[in-house]
Amino acid sequence: MNIKEFFCIFLPLLFLILFGKVYLSSFLLIYPGDIIFAFAISILTFRNSGVLLYIFIFFLGLLEGLDFLENEFIFGIYFVLIGIIWNHLKKYFSFESFELKISFWFFSILSFLIFRYVLLFYKLDVPVDWRLILNLAVKSFYYVCITFVWVLIFYKILNSFLSKTYEKV
């Protein structure tokens, strides 16, 4: 990721994403899934390393942590670790096929969901009931589906923007 891509593509998309998340959750009262995490995963699909990339991913983790029990720093570190793991796995697997990308996205979403629930149950001070677990299971299915749809949307948007930038060069 270079400065031009950051200011021309990623930063404006981040502002649109934050506006869309606020609009969907505040005005329409719809939980839009995890838009910020989906954006981070789709960025990691196209860019593998760089200091600016990891700073931006850490910042996205801080933004995500504001939504969930004030664990900003933990989520920032988790987002950077996902980036490091993705970069490390690119050495061993060829992520040229769309099926491998989908499997990594799905695995990342599920691992992030498990990470969120571990933090939730660690900070929870009430007894765990079967209705709570059933409610979390239903919300988890919705969460995975909607977040996966957002990943596909951001993948398509970033693919169109980044392929156009390389055609101009």
Which residues fall in each region the model found?
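Terminal, non-globular segments
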Residues: 1-169
